Amino acid sequence: MSETHLTNQKFADFSLHPEIQQALVESGFEYCTPIQALSLPILLEHKDIAGQAQTGTGKTLAFLVATFNHLLTTPIPDGRQLNQPRAIVMAPTRELAIQIAKDGELLAKHTGLKVGIVYGGESYEVQRKVLDKGVDILIGTTGRIIDYVRQGVINLSAIQAVVLDEADRMFDLGFIKDIRFLFRRMPDANERLNMLFSATLSMKVQELAYDHMNDPEKVEIAPSEKTSKNITEEIFYPSMEDKMRLLLTLIEEDWPEKAIVFSNTKHSCENLWAHLEGDGHRVGLLTGDVPQKKRIRILEQFTKGELDILVATDVAARGLHISDVSHVYNYDLPDDCEDYVHRIGRTGRAGQKGVSVSFACEEYALNLPAIEHYIQHSIPVTNYDSEALLDDIPPPVRIHRKHSPRPTGRSGGGKPQGGRPGARPRRHDRTRRHS
């Protein structure tokens, strides 16, 4: 569970079920983040909330604690059947659902409550077998949940707690009809605890909340501060000819411990992966076309430090909770201002420092004014010395074939294959020319 800066509010001060308190202590959670400190007092009084909070603010722990506590302190509905979960958590992406389920297991192992997860891209029958054994808390994407509802595998008439996470992205991805379909199959709003979280509480998100929740209380966390003060931002204006060389040079100079490179299209991400892989980096690729099992494996490798760089589109990376990301590179400036905030919010978490490097190239530079207006500050410009860029870049690898590690041919060194080297290549940090 990712954390941000903490408050003086302790979890121990809340009237939580003893098993929840034990789970929090053993998991190392003592102090609340702002969203937890504001939302839990409301939720523990069995009141609904609509919370505005970015990824990385601790909202996942907030709604999981509230959900588990509600189920442990509320009688099980009379006549509840094995195929009737008591709580449901809806997420816009498979990766987010998987992360929520992993976090939920930290609480589940202390409480005896069973967590089940369902999402597309994995075996329908394998997931069904888990559901057939009965789950208390169902976590998943709306499409797969609807499949099981229509087949009678699960029944939502015993739901006592509902979480809708990243509601704004649900709208972006066109899932709102699915959400309304599921809400109509649950008990009335006043018979359950309802929680909605969103990066923005737009009018359409608020309308959804008031349609399907019981007079929710609005909770907002620092709405005026879109980006963390822990993140150092800078922007370059590269030519299209220099763009790839600049990225490879900066990565070699910065030598990030764990970095995510964002691009706007699948094709561009594949091209980036091919060049980074060809340059000897340990890099993974996340786009919508990557099979689910491979996506999970790549994320595990990145989390464990077996990969140093992850190349991703916004949709593929939405909802990821990965700790210790030191650098974010925006190879393309996003078309959506909120995506810029989501991207750079992958770094600078838990009080750590982070670095965000953006490229305003000829194709996407027009997106910059809107982004700076949205984040309410200008991004410092860094010039670069084009003559200092790498000029001996190996050719990109082919994305559709397996390849053996090859030695780097760069005279200045290069990343050895097979593991993170102890020192970066011997190249002077002379590309940046600060104004």
From Swiss-Prot:
Q: Where is the Helicase ATP-binding domain?
A: 40-219
- What is the protein's species of origin? Shewanella loihica (strain ATCC BAA-1088 / PV-4)
Biased-composition ranges, Gly residues, are 410-421
Q: Any idea what job this protein has?
A: DEAD-box RNA helicase involved in RNA degradation. Has RNA-dependent ATPase activity and unwinds double-stranded RNA.
Principal location listed in the UniProt entry = cytoplasm
Composition bias of kind Basic residues appears in 423-435
Keyword annotations from UniProtKB, A to Z:
ATP-binding, Cytoplasm, Helicase, Hydrolase, Nucleotide-binding, RNA-binding
Q: Which CDD domains match?
A: DEADc, SF2_C_DEAD
Q: Which residues does ATP bind?
A: A53, Q54, T55, G56, T57, G58, K59, T60
Residue window of motif DEAD box: 165-168
Query: What reaction does this enzyme carry out catalytically?
Result: ATP + H2O = ADP + phosphate + H(+)
Please name the InterPro entries in this protein's record.
DEAD/DEAH_box_helicase_dom, DEAD_box_RNA_helicase, Helicase_ATP-bd, Helicase_C-like, P-loop_NTPase, RNA-helicase_DEAD-box_CS, RNA_helicase_ATP-dep_RhlB, RNA_helicase_DEAD_Q_motif
Subunit comment: Component of the RNA degradosome, which is a multiprotein complex involved in RNA processing and mRNA degradation.
Stored PANTHER family: ATP-DEPENDENT RNA HELICASE RHLB (PTHR47959:SF10), ATP-DEPENDENT RNA HELICASE RHLE-RELATED (PTHR47959)
Q: What is this protein called?
A: ATP-dependent RNA helicase RhlB
Q motif (motif): residue ranges = 9-37
In its UniProt record, which GO terms are filed under biological process? RNA catabolic process
Which gene is this protein's source?
Answer: rhlB
GO MF annotation, one: ATP hydrolysis activity
Q: Which SMART domains does its entry note?
A: DEXDc, HELICc
Please list the residue ranges annotated as the Helicase C-terminal domain: 243-390
Give the subcellular location: Cytoplasm
The family line of this record is: Belongs to the DEAD box helicase family. RhlB subfamily.
